[in-house]
Amino acid sequence: MVIGITAYWFALLGLRANGMLPSYIGMQGPILTLHTQKGKKLLDKLSRPKRFWRAWGNFGLGIALVVMIGTFLLLVLQAVSIIQNPPEPTAVTQPRNVLVIPGVNDFLPLSVAPEILLGLLIGLVVHEGGHGIFCRVEDIEIKSMGLALFAILPIGAFVEPDEENRREADRGGQSRMFAAGVTNNFAVTILVFMLLFGPIMGSVTVASGAAVGGVFDGSAAGDAGIERGDRIVAVNGTDVENNADLNQKLAAIDSRSVTVTVENGDERRQTTIERSLLVTAITQTSPFAAGDEQGSDEPAISTGENITAVNGTTVYTEKNLSQQLADRKVATLTVNGEQITGPIGALSTVQQDGPVSSADGLSAGDTLVITAIDGNRIVNSSDLSSTMDGYEAGQTVTVEAYTQDGDSDQRTTYDVTLDENNSGEAIVGILVAPGTSGIETSGFGTNLYPAETFRDLMAGQFMTTFGGGGGGDGPLTTFLLGVAGTLLLPFASLSMPVGYNFAGFVAWNTNFYAIQGPLSGLGGGLFILANALFWTGWINLNLGFFNCIPAFPLDGGHILRMGSEAIVSRLPTSQGRQVTTMITTTVGLTMLASLLLMIFGPQLLA
C-alpha cells in the first residue's frame, strides 16, 4: 500500500510540474483538494435568519468549550497513564485502527462500508456546511469549498474563508464560525440516535432460539454441520428460547447423542450431534499444558484435543467432567489415547500485595491450583467464584492448593485473611484462569452470540444491560449512557463482557433478529437503516470530539486562539501576540504528544 501511495504521489507531482493539473485541484503532500465556487448562493440563502444562527452559534460555542476542556484533560491524563503504566499492545492500540477505513481498521468490516461512508459523508457535509453558513452570517467571504482526498478516498471536506476578510470579523463571530461544524455534528448525533433508540430498534426483536456465533474446529457441532449464523430452535424436540435455555437443556441430557433443530433464513433442518469434550483453550501455566515451563517431559494437553476419560471413566460433557472430578483433587485425564496426571482445581497466580502473597512459601507471580477453601471442593474457576461469594473481607479461610515442587505437585494449606476489592467483595489476592486447572472445554462445540445484548445496546439500553436496571436514572442520563454504549459496540469484545464485536446488522447475524410493528414492511431494509443511523451517529460524535481537540489546524485550535487573544488583550502587556502564540503552541504540542503516545505508546513502551 505504501508503494502504491508513493507512486501515486510522484505521478501527481509530475502532472503538476508539467502544468497538467486543472486549476481547481490542489495538492498538500499526498492529499488532493478539489475546489469549487458552486454552492455559495445556497449558503447565502441558508444564512438569512442571522439572529437564529447567532443564538445557535453561541450555544454551540459553549458546548465546544466544555468538550475542548474535557478532551484536553482526557488526552493528557491518558498520556500520563501510558507513561507511568505502559499497557500491553492490543488490537485497539494498533496504529492502523486509528483510521476510519473499512477493511484497514480491524473493527470496521467491509460489509458495512457503505453505511460507514454514508455516515462520513453526512458528517463532512454538516460540519463544513456549518462553517460555510456562519461565514455568511458573520459576513466573511468564502474563497472556495471542496473535498479532500487521500488517493481516491474522501477523507474530508472544507470551506475556505477569505483570510483577510476573516481577520476583520470580531473574535466572537470567528469563534462561532469555528464552533459551528462540531455543533452540527453533535446535533446530527442526537437526532440519529433518537431515531435509532426509538422507532427503529423498537421494531427489532431477538428471534427465538440460541444464536450460533461460531463453531470450534473439530468440535461435535462442527462435525454435525452446525455453522455460524444458525439458530438452534429445539433440542430433542423441545423448543429452545435463547442461549441460556440451550445450555440448560443440554446440561439436563445425560445421553451422548442429542438431536437439534436448526433454522437459518427459510431453511429448517435437523441433525444429530455426538458430543465430545473438546479443549477450546488452555492457560500456558496449567499443569496439563503443552510446553510446560516446569520442564516436564510428560505428555500434555493442547487446544483442539479431546478429553475422553477421567481415571478411566468416559466423559463427553462439562457436566460429566465436573462429576468425575468432584472427589478427585488429583486426576488422570485421557487425551487422544495418552494419560496425563495433575492437580484439579482453579488455576491461580499470586498477585502483588494480595493477602495470600504473605503466606509462607508464596510470592507474587507464583502459580498454584486451589482445590478447596475451608473444605469446600473447588473444581474450576466458577466454583471458586461462587464459594468466595459466601465470605466477607476480614474473615480467615484455609486455602488448600497444589504448587510445583520440582517434577511433582506439592499439596499445601494456607491460612489467609481475606481482603476486599473496589466492589467490596472478599478476595484471596489471586488472578484466576478460566476453566478447570486452566483448561476450558466444550462438549457441544458452539460459541453462542449475545444477540439480545447487542439488540438492547443498539436500542440505547446500556443501564438495563450492564447497570442492573437503571430505572432511577433520568431520560437525559439514560440517553447519554445509551450513546456511550453504542460507541463501544465496534470494540465490544475488548470493552464489554461479550466475546464479539458488533459493527451492525450484517448478512450472517440478521438471522438472529426479527422485525415487528408498523415498520415491518421495510423487511431487511430496516437493518440497513439501523446500520446507517448507527454509523452516522458514531462518526459524527467522534468527528465532533476530534475537532474539539485544542490544536491547529483543528477547530479547537482556532477557538483556543480566539479565546487566548481575548484574554491576553486584557492583560497589561505589549507582547500580546507572542503570549497568545506561546499558549496555543504549548497546548497544541501537548495535544500532539498525547495523541502520539496514545497511538504508538503501547508498542514502544510496553
Features from the language model and the residues they span:
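Hydrophobic transmembrane alpha-helices and their immediate loop junctions
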Residues: M1-A606
